[in-house]
Amino acid sequence: MKVGTDIIQIDRIEKLIDRYGDTFKQRYLSKEEIAAAKKVETLAGYWAAKEAIAKAFGCGIGAQLAFHDIMIAKDSRGAPYFTLSDEALKTYTIHSASISISHDGGFAIAVAAIDFEAA
């Protein structure tokens, strides 16, 4: 089991959205994530979650695992979970995973715990 965490100032994401608008969202989020995230706090939480997940895999966001390789969603109870792109699944076999996202005091934070094997 590997753990990753990330924290980001919500206003940093808000400034990027103000500056780049939909271009920013489309570069880092899936269409489903954009549709689900009505508030900037949610977008910041998704950003932090993707970073935390990549850190748990031990590679961070980059050539091996990109923002679009990780998709964040919520189950029927509102709990967050993630899926990986088909390309990323060629690299990782996930046995179990859990993520938590929270925001307060102007920050969004996420923690990911993932039991996996690398190919």
UniProtKB/Swiss-Prot annotation:
Its cofactor is Mg(2+). Transmembrane segments: none annotated. One of its GO terms (molecular function) is holo-[acyl-carrier-protein] synthase activity. Its main location: cytoplasm. It is an enzyme of class 2 (transferase). The keyword Metal-binding applies. Gene3D superfamilies: 4'-phosphopantetheinyl transferase domain. InterPro entries: 4-PPantetheinyl_Trfase_dom, 4-PPantetheinyl_Trfase_dom_sf, ACPS, Ppantetheine-prot_Trfase_dom. Its EC number is 2.7.8.7. GO terms for cellular component: cytoplasm. Belongs to the P-Pant transferase superfamily. AcpS family. Transfers the 4'-phosphopantetheine moiety from coenzyme A to a Ser of acyl-carrier-protein. NCBIfam families: acpS, pantethn_trn. This is Holo-[acyl-carrier-protein] synthase. It comes from Sulfurovum sp. (strain NBC37-1).
